[in-house]
Amino acid sequence: MLNKEEIKKIIPQREPFLMIDEVEEFTPGESATAYKYVDEKEWYFKGHFPGNPIMPGVLITESLAQTGAVAILSLEENKNKNALFGGIDKMKFKKQVTPGDKLKLEVKIIKRKGPMGVGEAIASCDGKIVARGELTFAVV
């Protein structure tokens, strides 16, 4: 289990844009499982949407990307590097994420070639899939 301070030793994102709270498990270069505890005080709820707060799909996707970054940047050869989006494919949003939800984030690296790769990403709450798709990344 990694806490936020340990996560910051692997990925470069910082508050308020650090979108994962803890990493349950990870295998360098292969996979990672993380959690985002969705708090009612999150900065984005002020405008998305007042009176009906919903976590934006793009931020669910970013949370998944940061989870995948833990897997790929924890490789010794990628220390002190960054993982950038190369593309988002087949991303589907199935349920809303709201304050109080515990968002489970799972990413499995399914393809790697040089600095490029693809991760299969699934976000879920209470065992129900809220989003899934493929994230292409480049390590720089």
Per-region residue spans from a language model:
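Short aromatic-glycine motifs in intrinsically disordered, low-complexity regions
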Residues: L2-R14
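Beta-strand-rich interaction surfaces with strong enrichment in secreted/lumenal proteins
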Residues: K8, G51, F93-K95
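Conserved positions in beta-strands of structured domains
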Residues: D21-E24, D89, K94, K108-I110
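Active-site helix/loop of acyl-thioester processing domains in fatty-acid/polyketide metabolism
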Residues: V23, M55-N78
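HotDog/MaoC-like acyl-thioester-processing domains
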Residues: G29, T98-D101, K108-V140
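Hydrophobic beta-strand-centered segment that forms part of the acyl-chain substrate-binding groove
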Residues: M1, G68-K104, R132-A138
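Catalytic strand-loop segment that frames the active site of acyl-thioester-processing enzymes
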Residues: E15-M55, I60
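Extended beta-strand/beta-hairpin segments
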Residues: P12, Y37-D39, E106-K108, E120
